[in-house]
């Protein structure tokens, strides 16, 4: 593999991991917000 191919694959995985982590945090915060409103 050339260096450019490795860099491209690493970049794609990095983007996927960032998107996944960001999505999970949004879902967690959203669930907690609904839970708190439900209690009050």
UniProtKB/Swiss-Prot annotation:
The keyword Transport applies. GO terms for biological process: sensory perception of smell. Keywords: Olfaction, Sensory transduction, Transport. The keyword Isomerase does not apply. InterPro entries: Calycin (IPR012674), Lipocalin_CS (IPR022272). Binds the chemical odorant, 2-isobutyl-3-methoxypyrazine. Belongs to the calycin superfamily. Lipocalin family. Homodimer. This is Odorant-binding protein 3.
């Amino acid at each position: 593999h050339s260096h450019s191919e490795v860099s491209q694959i690493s970049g794609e995985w990095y983007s996927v991991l960032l998107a996944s982590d960001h999505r999970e945090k949004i879902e967690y915060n959203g669930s907690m917000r609904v839970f708190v409103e439900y209690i009050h």
